[in-house]
Amino acid sequence: MKKLFGLFLLGTIFVLLMVRPVGAEQQLSVVYPPANHQTVADRIFLVGTAPPTGKVLVNGKPIERSRAGHFAPSFPLRVGENTFILQYQDRQVQLKVQRQDTTPAPPVGLAFGKDSLTPNVDIARMPGELVCFSAIAPPQSVVSVQLGKDNIRLLPQLQQAQLPANSALLTGRNQPTRQLTSGQYQGCTTLPELGNLVDGNNTITSGFTPSTGIQPQFQLTLNSQTVTQPSPGKVTILSPANLEVVEVTANEGVARTGASTDYSRLTPLPKGTQAAVTGKEGEWLRLDYGGWINSKETRIIPGAIPPRSLIRSVSARRVSGATEIVFPLQVPVPVSIQQGDRTLTLTLYNTTAQTDTIRFDDDPTISRLDWQQVTPDRLEYIFNLKSQQQWGYKLRYEGTSLVLTLRHSPKIQNSKFKIQNSKFQVSDFQLPCTGAQQCAPTDSPLAGIKILLDPGHGGKETGALGPTGYPEKDINLLISKLVREQLARRGAEVYLTREDDRDLSLPDRVDIIDKIEPAIAISLHYNALPDAGNAMKTKGLAAFWYHPQAHDLASFLHSYLVQKLNRPDYGLYWNNLALTRPASAPTILLELGFMINPYEFEWIVNPQAQQQLASAIAQGITQWFSNIEINS
């Protein structure tokens, strides 16, 4: 996993090594926190190692260590500089950790808080929409904002619930907190119709161009003194009769629930999708169906009117290993996909049906296609499926026709296994064939199955570091190769995204999955924590999924590995990760243990445990395929 303690923490940690001439057996090392690191967390853990004999002291007190001498104690942090002195015999490591105060600094004198005025980027909205403003000002101030001829009073907000980051779930600290917010002022207004908003001597009458927007003027009055400051962002009212139309230029336009990468993802929009723009916030565009997209993934279509389409007939065609359903449209419209148990629902926006005829012959995957006009401009197609397990889908536009590809069940070439698969079992850690033995057909329960393994990280991206400095990228690759060997002995056709220590971007890994189209894809990782976690007490195996088609695989493998290996259970998670998002195959990510936990790290680097883990993963995959109806 892209390590949380490297992502969620900012920082400056000053590390001073006071080295004395001692023997190699007296080495003391600290691998976390790194140099130049600061944090907003209220605690931090120190990960490192020293020879197992003797004691390691932190600020004069002995700390807990594993049998091999590894340690990862946590300590509270006060705001400001915190000093830790680690000592083993005559070697010392001094750490200075800076905890930042997240409370906004109150303004000094008659002034607004620094960078506190919002909107802080240009925004555009439709007439009648609610727009809100906020500022930080001295207590007892009278604060307002002038928007054209409208004056909006901003009122003090004495208490607000603060939500922690998503990563707080990983440490069990994800509950909202109530905070007194002295000096926080907020207020909202409904935007008027065009022609009713006056800016000086100008009446705002049209458009999306920022130059036609109004810059809100914030006013603060305290002790009979007044100061005025313009907002960093302008407000523009869009004309419903003159909306811009954009086309998605990315292969998969990233649609979100709001105007930043903090917001959740929606179904990606296929290249060529067209939609009207009904809102803007900085570089983000709100499309007419409700999703937001970064303007860098679009182009403006000059003179285009808001896209609307009719649809009449629908047809299906067989291709190798899949069924393609073709929806002839007048214009490429926004779409979304929702998977359920034995169903897949395709939604077409800005579309109205004139459908009398659909041809849909008997299909290996689909039992029936239903449809309904949910609203005058929103249409749903419900695919009723023959199997509960789905094997992947793709969306693309060919001209103005939408093509939905639904993959068929993989076919196991071992005919004997196809008959007996419901009874197939393997004992713990037993290999169907070993060494120079040739696998007979009955020894190849995964014959004909393509499986992709993704060893996480690589190259400059080390991933998490164990107490000795051993990088996650290396153990990810080692375990992936061991799993490949065991899957191949069971007859599977196994692919790795990388065979050696190299840089490989997340998009490149996703492209490999989409190109190979395996039956399943598994990204293999080891875990770490944000600073607020307890590295000494946290360990175990976790599985992550995103699309419903991957849930059963993630759930089964997670439970199987925890039980067969007698490992701690760190949980089953829905998570928006790059290597769980591919829709072309059931794709999951496994976190096989915590690199930063001193005790679990000893299990991670144990060669016998590595072989057992690889065997259990291969057996779990084999058992999962035997449990599902893949040849119905």
Question: Residues of each region from the PLM?
Answer:
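Aromatic-lined ligand-binding clefts that engage carbohydrates, nucleic acids, or primary amines
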Residues: 48-50
